[in-house]
A protein has these predicted regions:
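Conserved donor-binding/catalytic core segment of Leloir-type glycosyltransferases
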Residues: 156, 187-219, 231
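Carbohydrate-associated surface elements
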Residues: 161, 182
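Nucleotide-activated donor-binding/catalytic signature segment of Leloir-type glycosyltransferases, i.e.
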Residues: 241-261
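Aromatic "clamp/platform" in nucleotide-sugar-dependent glycosyltransferases that forms part
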Residues: 281
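Conserved acidic donor-binding segment of nucleotide-sugar-dependent glycosyltransferases
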Residues: 313-325, 333-339
Protein backbone atom coordinates (compact mmCIF):
# COMPACT_ATOMS: atom_id res chain seq x y z
CA UNK A 1 0.00 0.00 0.00
CA UNK A 2 1.27 3.53 -0.70
CA UNK A 3 3.09 5.15 2.22
CA UNK A 4 1.06 8.34 1.81
CA UNK A 5 -2.36 6.63 1.94
CA UNK A 6 -4.80 9.01 3.61
CA UNK A 7 -5.98 6.12 5.78
CA UNK A 8 -2.61 5.57 7.41
CA UNK A 9 -2.87 6.24 11.14
CA UNK A 10 -6.60 7.03 10.99
CA UNK A 11 -9.03 5.41 13.43
CA UNK A 12 -12.16 3.75 12.07
CA UNK A 13 -14.88 2.34 14.34
CA UNK A 14 -17.48 -0.14 13.03
CA UNK A 15 -20.73 -0.54 14.97
CA UNK A 16 -22.34 -3.89 14.16
CA UNK A 17 -24.84 -6.10 15.96
CA UNK A 18 -22.72 -9.23 15.29
CA UNK A 19 -19.30 -10.50 14.28
CA UNK A 20 -18.32 -13.66 12.40
CA UNK A 21 -17.60 -15.59 15.61
CA UNK A 22 -21.18 -15.04 16.77
CA UNK A 23 -23.17 -18.28 16.21
CA UNK A 24 -25.77 -16.17 14.38
CA UNK A 25 -23.21 -14.37 12.22
CA UNK A 26 -23.40 -14.70 8.47
CA UNK A 27 -22.47 -13.08 5.18
CA UNK A 28 -23.04 -9.51 6.39
CA UNK A 29 -20.48 -9.97 9.15
CA UNK A 30 -18.03 -11.62 6.78
CA UNK A 31 -18.33 -8.61 4.48
CA UNK A 32 -17.74 -6.21 7.39
CA UNK A 33 -14.63 -7.96 8.66
CA UNK A 34 -13.17 -8.33 5.17
CA UNK A 35 -13.47 -4.64 4.30
CA UNK A 36 -12.23 -3.79 7.81
CA UNK A 37 -9.16 -5.94 7.16
CA UNK A 38 -8.62 -3.96 3.96
CA UNK A 39 -8.53 -0.75 5.98
CA UNK A 40 -5.97 -2.28 8.36
CA UNK A 41 -3.82 -3.24 5.36
CA UNK A 42 -3.88 0.41 4.32
CA UNK A 43 -2.62 1.58 7.70
CA UNK A 44 -5.86 2.38 9.54
CA UNK A 45 -6.52 1.40 13.16
CA UNK A 46 -9.85 -0.43 13.19
CA UNK A 47 -12.21 -1.27 16.05
CA UNK A 48 -15.34 -3.40 15.61
CA UNK A 49 -18.03 -3.03 18.30
CA UNK A 50 -20.65 -5.78 18.45
CA UNK A 51 -22.84 -7.80 20.83
CA UNK A 52 -21.25 -10.07 23.41
CA UNK A 53 -21.63 -13.84 23.06
CA UNK A 54 -20.22 -17.02 24.58
CA UNK A 55 -18.03 -17.90 21.60
CA UNK A 56 -15.60 -14.99 22.05
CA UNK A 57 -14.09 -12.82 24.83
CA UNK A 58 -15.31 -9.29 25.64
CA UNK A 59 -12.25 -7.81 23.95
CA UNK A 60 -9.56 -9.17 21.65
CA UNK A 61 -7.42 -8.27 18.66
CA UNK A 62 -7.65 -10.55 15.62
CA UNK A 63 -5.54 -9.91 12.51
CA UNK A 64 -5.01 -6.32 13.55
CA UNK A 65 -8.71 -5.61 14.19
CA UNK A 66 -9.76 -4.77 17.75
CA UNK A 67 -13.08 -6.32 18.77
CA UNK A 68 -15.14 -4.89 21.63
CA UNK A 69 -18.19 -7.00 22.57
CA UNK A 70 -20.91 -5.70 24.88
CA UNK A 71 -24.64 -6.05 25.28
CA UNK A 72 -27.19 -8.48 23.92
CA UNK A 73 -28.95 -8.77 20.59
CA UNK A 74 -31.10 -5.75 21.49
CA UNK A 75 -29.08 -3.82 24.08
CA UNK A 76 -26.05 -3.74 21.76
CA UNK A 77 -27.41 -0.54 20.20
CA UNK A 78 -27.50 1.42 23.46
CA UNK A 79 -24.16 -0.09 24.49
CA UNK A 80 -22.65 0.98 21.18
CA UNK A 81 -23.78 4.58 21.61
CA UNK A 82 -22.44 4.60 25.16
CA UNK A 83 -19.07 3.14 24.16
CA UNK A 84 -18.68 5.61 21.30
CA UNK A 85 -19.62 8.58 23.46
CA UNK A 86 -17.30 7.59 26.34
CA UNK A 87 -14.32 7.02 24.09
CA UNK A 88 -14.17 3.27 24.71
CA UNK A 89 -13.66 2.80 20.96
CA UNK A 90 -10.82 5.30 20.78
CA UNK A 91 -11.13 8.62 18.98
CA UNK A 92 -12.42 7.48 15.60
CA UNK A 93 -11.89 9.69 12.58
CA UNK A 94 -14.72 7.85 10.78
CA UNK A 95 -17.59 5.78 12.19
CA UNK A 96 -19.18 3.00 10.10
CA UNK A 97 -22.74 2.42 11.33
CA UNK A 98 -23.85 -1.01 10.12
CA UNK A 99 -27.63 -0.84 9.72
CA UNK A 100 -29.14 -4.32 9.82
CA UNK A 101 -32.69 -3.04 10.09
CA UNK A 102 -31.86 -0.76 13.01
CA UNK A 103 -29.09 1.86 13.06
CA UNK A 104 -26.85 2.54 16.06
CA UNK A 105 -27.94 6.22 16.14
CA UNK A 106 -24.25 7.14 16.04
CA UNK A 107 -24.99 10.58 14.60
CA UNK A 108 -26.41 11.53 18.01
CA UNK A 109 -23.11 10.98 19.85
CA UNK A 110 -20.35 11.89 17.38
CA UNK A 111 -19.46 14.81 15.16
CA UNK A 112 -17.11 12.67 13.09
CA UNK A 113 -18.11 11.55 9.57
CA UNK A 114 -20.48 8.58 9.62
CA UNK A 115 -20.71 6.00 6.83
CA UNK A 116 -23.90 3.91 6.91
CA UNK A 117 -23.45 0.35 5.63
CA UNK A 118 -26.68 -1.34 4.48
CA UNK A 119 -26.97 -4.86 3.09
CA UNK A 120 -30.68 -4.67 2.39
CA UNK A 121 -33.85 -2.96 3.53
CA UNK A 122 -35.93 -5.08 5.91
CA UNK A 123 -39.43 -4.13 4.76
CA UNK A 124 -40.50 -7.75 4.22
CA UNK A 125 -38.56 -9.17 7.17
CA UNK A 126 -39.97 -7.07 10.03
CA UNK A 127 -43.44 -8.73 10.05
CA UNK A 128 -41.88 -12.19 9.65
CA UNK A 129 -39.29 -11.98 12.44
CA UNK A 130 -41.16 -9.56 14.74
CA UNK A 131 -44.92 -9.82 14.12
CA UNK A 132 -47.15 -7.14 15.57
CA UNK A 133 -46.18 -3.86 17.21
CA UNK A 134 -42.45 -4.61 17.54
CA UNK A 135 -42.10 -5.16 13.82
CA UNK A 136 -44.10 -2.03 13.00
CA UNK A 137 -41.89 0.07 15.29
CA UNK A 138 -38.75 -1.43 13.76
CA UNK A 139 -39.95 -0.70 10.24
CA UNK A 140 -40.89 2.86 11.25
CA UNK A 141 -37.36 3.45 12.56
CA UNK A 142 -35.78 2.00 9.43
CA UNK A 143 -38.17 3.73 7.03
CA UNK A 144 -38.63 7.15 8.67
CA UNK A 145 -36.20 7.81 11.51
CA UNK A 146 -32.93 6.50 10.05
CA UNK A 147 -33.11 8.36 6.70
CA UNK A 148 -33.79 11.60 8.58
CA UNK A 149 -31.05 11.08 11.16
CA UNK A 150 -28.43 10.16 8.55
CA UNK A 151 -29.59 12.60 5.87
CA UNK A 152 -26.08 14.09 5.58
CA UNK A 153 -24.15 10.84 5.84
CA UNK A 154 -22.48 8.72 3.19
CA UNK A 155 -24.14 5.35 2.54
CA UNK A 156 -22.68 2.09 1.24
CA UNK A 157 -25.01 -0.51 -0.29
CA UNK A 158 -23.83 -3.98 -1.30
CA UNK A 159 -25.97 -4.10 -4.45
CA UNK A 160 -27.80 -1.86 -6.86
CA UNK A 161 -31.06 -3.37 -5.60
CA UNK A 162 -30.28 -2.15 -2.08
CA UNK A 163 -29.34 1.27 -3.44
CA UNK A 164 -32.71 1.46 -5.18
CA UNK A 165 -34.53 0.45 -1.98
CA UNK A 166 -32.70 3.15 -0.02
CA UNK A 167 -33.84 5.62 -2.66
CA UNK A 168 -37.43 4.58 -1.98
CA UNK A 169 -36.84 5.52 1.67
CA UNK A 170 -35.70 8.98 0.66
CA UNK A 171 -31.91 8.48 0.73
CA UNK A 172 -30.44 10.52 -2.12
CA UNK A 173 -28.64 8.41 -4.71
CA UNK A 174 -25.68 10.78 -4.83
CA UNK A 175 -24.86 9.71 -1.27
CA UNK A 176 -25.00 5.94 -1.92
CA UNK A 177 -21.96 4.05 -3.20
CA UNK A 178 -22.35 0.41 -4.22
CA UNK A 179 -19.55 -1.85 -3.01
CA UNK A 180 -20.29 -5.46 -3.91
CA UNK A 181 -19.26 -8.58 -2.06
CA UNK A 182 -16.26 -10.53 -3.25
CA UNK A 183 -15.65 -14.25 -3.63
CA UNK A 184 -12.86 -16.06 -1.84
CA UNK A 185 -10.33 -18.12 -3.80
CA UNK A 186 -11.68 -21.59 -4.52
CA UNK A 187 -11.31 -24.09 -1.69
CA UNK A 188 -9.88 -27.24 -3.31
CA UNK A 189 -11.95 -30.33 -2.61
CA UNK A 190 -12.15 -33.55 -4.53
CA UNK A 191 -14.85 -35.94 -5.55
CA UNK A 192 -16.81 -33.99 -8.13
CA UNK A 193 -20.58 -34.01 -8.45
CA UNK A 194 -22.76 -36.47 -6.59
CA UNK A 195 -23.65 -39.54 -8.70
CA UNK A 196 -27.29 -39.01 -7.71
CA UNK A 197 -29.25 -35.73 -7.87
CA UNK A 198 -28.47 -33.45 -4.92
CA UNK A 199 -29.64 -29.91 -4.14
CA UNK A 200 -28.01 -27.81 -1.41
CA UNK A 201 -29.22 -24.96 0.77
CA UNK A 202 -26.51 -23.06 2.64
CA UNK A 203 -27.00 -20.27 5.17
CA UNK A 204 -28.38 -19.26 8.54
CA UNK A 205 -31.51 -21.16 9.49
CA UNK A 206 -33.94 -18.34 10.18
CA UNK A 207 -37.52 -17.81 8.94
CA UNK A 208 -36.78 -15.35 6.14
CA UNK A 209 -34.41 -17.83 4.47
CA UNK A 210 -37.53 -19.92 3.73
CA UNK A 211 -35.76 -23.29 3.68
CA UNK A 212 -39.27 -24.80 3.79
CA UNK A 213 -39.64 -23.88 0.12
CA UNK A 214 -36.62 -26.01 -0.79
CA UNK A 215 -37.91 -28.90 1.33
CA UNK A 216 -41.31 -28.71 -0.38
CA UNK A 217 -39.71 -28.59 -3.83
CA UNK A 218 -37.49 -31.62 -3.27
CA UNK A 219 -40.33 -33.67 -1.82
CA UNK A 220 -42.59 -32.69 -4.73
CA UNK A 221 -39.94 -33.95 -7.15
CA UNK A 222 -39.39 -37.31 -5.42
CA UNK A 223 -41.73 -39.24 -7.77
CA UNK A 224 -39.70 -38.02 -10.77
CA UNK A 225 -36.28 -38.21 -9.11
CA UNK A 226 -36.49 -40.97 -6.46
CA UNK A 227 -32.83 -40.58 -5.47
CA UNK A 228 -33.01 -36.78 -5.07
CA UNK A 229 -31.75 -35.41 -1.76
CA UNK A 230 -31.57 -31.97 -0.16
CA UNK A 231 -28.59 -31.13 2.06
CA UNK A 232 -29.18 -28.21 4.41
CA UNK A 233 -25.98 -26.59 5.69
CA UNK A 234 -26.08 -24.06 8.52
CA UNK A 235 -27.53 -23.43 11.95
CA UNK A 236 -29.82 -20.90 13.59
CA UNK A 237 -32.70 -20.40 15.97
CA UNK A 238 -35.22 -21.72 13.41
CA UNK A 239 -33.38 -25.04 13.01
CA UNK A 240 -35.57 -27.12 15.34
CA UNK A 241 -38.69 -25.86 13.57
CA UNK A 242 -37.21 -26.95 10.24
CA UNK A 243 -36.46 -30.44 11.60
CA UNK A 244 -40.09 -30.66 12.73
CA UNK A 245 -41.31 -29.40 9.37
CA UNK A 246 -39.30 -31.99 7.44
CA UNK A 247 -40.50 -34.76 9.76
CA UNK A 248 -44.15 -33.67 9.45
CA UNK A 249 -43.80 -33.68 5.66
CA UNK A 250 -42.45 -37.24 5.75
CA UNK A 251 -39.09 -36.24 4.30
CA UNK A 252 -37.20 -39.22 5.71
CA UNK A 253 -33.72 -39.55 4.22
CA UNK A 254 -34.53 -37.13 1.39
CA UNK A 255 -33.62 -34.12 3.57
CA UNK A 256 -30.32 -34.13 5.46
CA UNK A 257 -29.47 -31.42 7.99
CA UNK A 258 -25.68 -31.06 8.12
CA UNK A 259 -25.55 -28.30 10.74
CA UNK A 260 -22.69 -25.82 10.94
CA UNK A 261 -19.73 -27.12 8.91
CA UNK A 262 -16.09 -26.21 8.56
CA UNK A 263 -15.15 -24.26 5.44
CA UNK A 264 -13.67 -27.38 3.85
CA UNK A 265 -16.76 -29.49 4.54
CA UNK A 266 -19.06 -26.70 3.36
CA UNK A 267 -17.21 -26.47 0.06
CA UNK A 268 -17.34 -30.25 -0.28
CA UNK A 269 -21.15 -29.88 -0.24
CA UNK A 270 -20.95 -27.16 -2.92
CA UNK A 271 -18.73 -29.45 -4.99
CA UNK A 272 -21.15 -32.40 -4.83
CA UNK A 273 -24.34 -30.40 -5.32
CA UNK A 274 -25.98 -30.33 -8.72
CA UNK A 275 -27.78 -27.11 -7.83
CA UNK A 276 -27.92 -24.52 -5.04
CA UNK A 277 -31.41 -23.44 -3.95
CA UNK A 278 -31.66 -19.92 -2.50
CA UNK A 279 -35.33 -19.40 -1.53
CA UNK A 280 -34.64 -16.38 0.71
CA UNK A 281 -37.25 -13.67 1.09
CA UNK A 282 -34.45 -11.09 0.95
CA UNK A 283 -30.75 -11.09 0.08
CA UNK A 284 -28.58 -8.01 -0.10
CA UNK A 285 -26.27 -9.96 -2.37
CA UNK A 286 -26.11 -13.69 -1.68
CA UNK A 287 -22.56 -14.65 -0.76
CA UNK A 288 -23.36 -18.34 -1.15
CA UNK A 289 -24.05 -17.82 -4.86
CA UNK A 290 -20.40 -17.04 -5.56
CA UNK A 291 -19.16 -19.76 -3.22
CA UNK A 292 -21.25 -22.37 -5.04
CA UNK A 293 -20.30 -20.91 -8.40
CA UNK A 294 -16.61 -21.56 -7.74
CA UNK A 295 -17.50 -25.25 -7.82
CA UNK A 296 -19.59 -24.98 -10.96
CA UNK A 297 -22.87 -25.19 -9.06
CA UNK A 298 -25.62 -22.96 -10.51
CA UNK A 299 -28.15 -21.23 -8.26
CA UNK A 300 -31.94 -21.16 -8.44
CA UNK A 301 -33.20 -18.13 -6.50
CA UNK A 302 -36.12 -15.75 -6.18
CA UNK A 303 -35.92 -12.62 -8.28
CA UNK A 304 -37.82 -10.65 -5.61
CA UNK A 305 -34.99 -11.20 -3.11
CA UNK A 306 -33.26 -8.16 -4.62
CA UNK A 307 -29.51 -8.69 -4.60
CA UNK A 308 -29.91 -12.02 -6.39
CA UNK A 309 -30.62 -10.04 -9.57
CA UNK A 310 -26.92 -9.11 -9.55
CA UNK A 311 -25.25 -12.13 -7.95
CA UNK A 312 -27.15 -14.53 -10.25
CA UNK A 313 -26.98 -13.82 -13.98
CA UNK A 314 -30.32 -15.25 -15.07
CA UNK A 315 -29.85 -17.86 -17.79
CA UNK A 316 -26.05 -17.71 -17.58
CA UNK A 317 -24.99 -18.65 -14.04
CA UNK A 318 -28.35 -19.73 -12.67
CA UNK A 319 -32.08 -19.18 -12.87
CA UNK A 320 -34.27 -16.56 -11.20
CA UNK A 321 -37.91 -17.40 -10.51
CA UNK A 322 -40.91 -15.42 -9.32
CA UNK A 323 -42.79 -17.78 -6.98
CA UNK A 324 -42.60 -21.07 -5.10
CA UNK A 325 -44.00 -23.17 -7.94
CA UNK A 326 -41.42 -21.57 -10.21
CA UNK A 327 -38.68 -22.75 -7.85
CA UNK A 328 -39.93 -26.33 -8.05
CA UNK A 329 -40.30 -26.17 -11.83
CA UNK A 330 -36.83 -24.69 -12.37
CA UNK A 331 -35.21 -27.33 -10.18
CA UNK A 332 -37.06 -30.08 -12.05
CA UNK A 333 -36.05 -28.75 -15.46
CA UNK A 334 -32.39 -28.36 -14.53
CA UNK A 335 -32.13 -31.74 -12.82
CA UNK A 336 -33.49 -33.36 -15.99
CA UNK A 337 -31.38 -31.37 -18.48
CA UNK A 338 -27.69 -32.26 -18.12
CA UNK A 339 -26.61 -30.12 -21.08
CA UNK A 340 -28.30 -26.98 -19.78
CA UNK A 341 -27.00 -27.64 -16.30
CA UNK A 342 -23.45 -27.96 -17.65
CA UNK A 343 -23.83 -24.66 -19.51
CA UNK A 344 -25.00 -22.89 -16.36
CA UNK A 345 -22.18 -24.55 -14.44
CA UNK A 346 -19.62 -22.93 -16.73
CA UNK A 347 -21.37 -19.59 -16.36
CA UNK A 348 -21.42 -19.93 -12.58
CA UNK A 349 -17.64 -20.39 -12.52
CA UNK A 350 -17.14 -17.30 -14.68
CA UNK A 351 -19.52 -15.13 -12.65
CA UNK A 352 -17.98 -16.19 -9.33
CA UNK A 353 -14.72 -14.49 -10.37
CA UNK A 354 -16.33 -11.24 -11.53
CA UNK A 355 -15.93 -9.60 -8.12
CA UNK A 356 -13.02 -10.14 -5.73
CA UNK A 357 -12.58 -9.23 -2.09
CA UNK A 358 -9.48 -7.24 -2.99
CA UNK A 359 -11.60 -5.10 -5.27
CA UNK A 360 -14.28 -4.68 -2.58
CA UNK A 361 -11.63 -3.67 -0.04
CA UNK A 362 -10.22 -0.94 -2.27
CA UNK A 363 -13.69 0.32 -3.19
CA UNK A 364 -14.73 0.51 0.46
CA UNK A 365 -11.43 2.18 1.36
CA UNK A 366 -12.15 4.78 -1.33
CA UNK A 367 -15.46 5.60 0.36
CA UNK A 368 -13.76 6.02 3.75
CA UNK A 369 -11.07 8.26 2.20
CA UNK A 370 -13.81 10.41 0.68
CA UNK A 371 -15.54 10.67 4.07
CA UNK A 372 -12.28 11.84 5.63
CA UNK A 373 -12.03 14.53 2.95
CA UNK A 374 -15.65 15.63 3.36
CA UNK A 375 -16.75 14.24 0.00
CA UNK A 376 -19.66 12.04 -1.00
CA UNK A 377 -19.36 9.29 -3.59
CA UNK A 378 -21.93 7.35 -5.58
CA UNK A 379 -22.04 4.76 -8.32
CA UNK A 380 -20.97 1.13 -8.53
CA UNK A 381 -17.63 -0.63 -8.11
CA UNK A 382 -17.90 -2.45 -11.43
CA UNK A 383 -15.07 -4.86 -12.30
CA UNK A 384 -11.99 -3.00 -13.43
CA UNK A 385 -13.05 0.17 -11.63
CA UNK A 386 -11.16 0.55 -8.38
CA UNK A 387 -13.20 3.33 -6.78
CA UNK A 388 -16.88 4.23 -6.73
CA UNK A 389 -17.57 6.95 -9.24
CA UNK A 390 -19.03 10.46 -9.21
CA UNK A 391 -17.37 12.24 -6.27
CA UNK A 392 -19.23 15.22 -4.86
CA UNK A 393 -18.69 17.67 -2.04
CA UNK A 394 -20.36 16.96 1.27
CA UNK A 395 -23.79 18.42 1.79
CA UNK A 396 -23.97 21.15 4.44
Amino acid sequence: MPEDDLLRGKEVAFLSWRDTRNPEGGGAERYLETVAAGLVQRGARVTVFCAAHAAAPPEEVVDGIRFVRRGTKLSVYAEGMRALRRGDLGRPDVVVDVQNGLPFFSRLVTRRPVVVLVHHVHREQWPVVYPGLTGRVGWFIERRVAPLLYRRSQYVAVSQATRDELGELGVRRRRVAVVHNGTDPVVPVGGGKSPTPMVAVVGRLVPHKRVEHAIDAVLALQPTFPDLTLEVVGSGWWEARLHDYARERGAGDAVVFRGHLSEADKHEVYERAWLLALPSLKEGWGLVVGEAGMHGTPTVAYREAGGTQESVVDGFSGVLVDHQQGLTTALAELLADEERRARLSRGARVTSHAFTWEHAQESFAAVVRAALEGRRVSGQDTPGQDTPEQPDRAEP
